[in-house]
């Protein structure tokens, strides 16, 4: 037994220059852990609360001094003396202190940072990497990266309503090779955008945020309907993959999308392409069935292997229909739908509303609950995709988590911005440490599909 001796929280800044919580933990025998809470831009209604101060005179109301104070004055005194290796007790104590379903009293940003810092301190004391502390001898599978190279939606000031267009190097033989393929494709995409005199500035997650001015002679609704911005983005990705010297498809690089459709779903229960509506001053909306047909069309025309949040978080019936239609050949990922919450994941499994769960630690708020969500997902025969948030730090915990629980997939941004690259570099370190024991499944990571 090694007791927690000290816990200290402070306010720091994330990749957007917005405050977040950092927590340090020390144990009696020299263990030390430090963790930083991430933050999302598009959030699900059932996510655990990210506690903000609300003082408009300071950081536009986004300060986290309340969450920091809760850690230092409420959580820390209760955890001092508890065994650092007893993660369940640590997390349960914090859940009891908060006492609310969505951690609205103490804030999930503070609770999560403490939970992760304790785990890191325990691993430090045992002098083993975090992934081995959490996963033991089974922790040896490197994830297929899901790299966000074109940003839209809430993540960028671009013409694209869908939030993320990603590449997945499923044909690579190792994680390091997968990263090389991804980097070369990212640079090829940049070259293509430059040749079209488009913007090569990057969004929150390091992907490009093009305006596609070159793709449309007229900015009227019929032009956008004839070739949607999503199709322009997909065409670009296929061209970039080829330009980099790789095959679009199962033997090379496939494509994933995050539609973030909850952001498009309005009170009329239709999906509105808001950015197109703004440009054209005309309404363009789809019913749930029409959106499903549109996504099916994209899947039939492009090498797409994964679609996240293809429908809104309240459109459970639509998710079930989408999974029935294309779930045998495409990974249907629930993010806003499940918010890493075992309660909603169980509901999704029963309804057959998806075949994959996105795992975001700050959506649920503790390491123990995150592990429960991963375990429930995998037992159902679904995949679990460990994910970052759009507001990140240099914290690399999710890299260790993906390996610890052999999730096989990780979503952590593009090939730019050090807050994203830090996770990839950590995975390269882990691959090196594992040596010949390292496994990279590639296409086999999609065990939920009929390949």
Curated annotation (Swiss-Prot):
The active site is at 205 (proton donor), 360 (proton acceptor). Mg(2+) binds at residues 258, 308, 335. The keyword Manganese does not apply. GO terms for cellular component: cell surface; extracellular region; phosphopyruvate hydratase complex. (2R)-2-phosphoglycerate binds at residues 163, 360, 389-390, 411. Pathway: Carbohydrate degradation; glycolysis; pyruvate from D-glyceraldehyde 3-phosphate: step 4/5. Pfam families: Enolase_C, Enolase_N. It catalyses: (2R)-2-phosphoglycerate = phosphoenolpyruvate + H2O. The keyword Translocase does not apply. Keywords: Cytoplasm, Glycolysis, Lyase, Magnesium, Metal-binding, Secreted. Its main location: cytoplasm. It is found in: Cytoplasm; Secreted; Cell surface. GO terms for biological process: glycolytic process. Its cofactor is Mg(2+). Its EC number is 4.2.1.11. Binds a second Mg(2+) ion via substrate during catalysis. One of its GO terms (molecular function) is magnesium ion binding. Catalyzes the reversible conversion of 2-phosphoglycerate (2-PG) into phosphoenolpyruvate (PEP). It is essential for the degradation of carbohydrates via glycolysis. Belongs to the enolase family. This is Enolase. It comes from Mycoplasma capricolum subsp. capricolum (strain California kid / ATCC 27343 / NCTC 10154). The gene is eno.
